[in-house]
């Protein structure tokens, strides 16, 4: 068996180097071979491995793309509008939560389904059940307005003497948000369930009678403060009026006084001393020589 030998020329040509590289690739299975003094032969990428820039076109899933009307398309995640106010965001989240609750399947099992407090009906008001956690149907809600009617935040402050931190705590008093009917850009209108507000007021003040007594005390205190404020303003007005009158009198009626010593008498216990007196009370003494 003869041993084959490869004779390498001292100065191989470029064609010989290429042939040698191809032989090494076939023997070793390597796709890239680095040779000193030669350029690197890189493997070409397949179509799937090409970058987004080198591709002939870019694939988009239009089911995950939203047209923002801004000249470009945004994928997957919806970018939150930074101009949305916190009040608007809170109202939108509440509406989305109520929509999901309305679309949820109704539990028709009479054993496990939640029932109305008043009539045991399973057709509950989803808004009251979701926000106030109150099991009441539409019929009973309209039938008992003294219990299930809604109160504004101002009414809770004035009639039940509740504070702002208490009304902002949703664990104490759940609230229903509605767009402000007076101005669209204003804060949302907050509505509270009447019987929940009354129960919290009883816990805070002890009883409704104690609440009425506190209300009367504050009304009397408010009236006294109002009267004191009025008296203070009246006193300030009188001071300003008196000062202005005096200034006008001093400017218009005040004239230059000229002393006239009409009264003249001798000073007692001091003979020879003559006293002259003016109507304004000024006195001068003269000594007779």
From Swiss-Prot:
Function, as annotated, reads: Involved in nucleotide excision repair (NER). Functional in repair of ultraviolet radiation induced damages and in mitotic mutation avoidance. Binds damaged DNA. Binds specifically to base-base mismatches or small insertion/deletion loops with unpaired nucleotides. Maintains GT repeat stability. Functions as a part of the short-patch excision repair system.
> Which keywords does UniProt give here?
DNA damage, DNA repair, DNA-binding, Metal-binding, Nucleus, Zinc, Zinc-finger
Which residues participate in Zn(2+) binding? 116, 119, 137, 140
**Pfam families referenced in this protein's UniProt entry, alphabetically:** XPA_C (PF05181), XPA_N (PF01286)
Q: Which parts of the sequence are unnamed zinc fingers? A: 116-140
Q: Which GO terms describe its biological process?
A: base-excision repair; nucleotide-excision repair; nucleotide-excision repair involved in interstrand cross-link repair; nucleotide-excision repair, DNA damage recognition; UV-damage excision repair
Q: Which InterPro entries match?
A: DNA-bd_dom_put_sf, XPA/RAD14, XPA_C, XPA_sf, Znf_XPA_CS
What S-S linkages are listed for this chain?
A: none
Q: Where in the cell is it found?
A: Nucleus
> What would you give as a GO molecular function for this chain, any one?
damaged DNA binding
The terms describing its cellular component in GO are: nucleotide-excision repair factor 1 complex
Q: What is this protein called?
A: DNA repair protein rad14
Quaternary structure, from the entry: Interacts with hrq1.
Q: Which family does it belong to?
A: Belongs to the XPA family.
Gene3D superfamilies registered for this protein in UniProt = XPA C-terminal domain
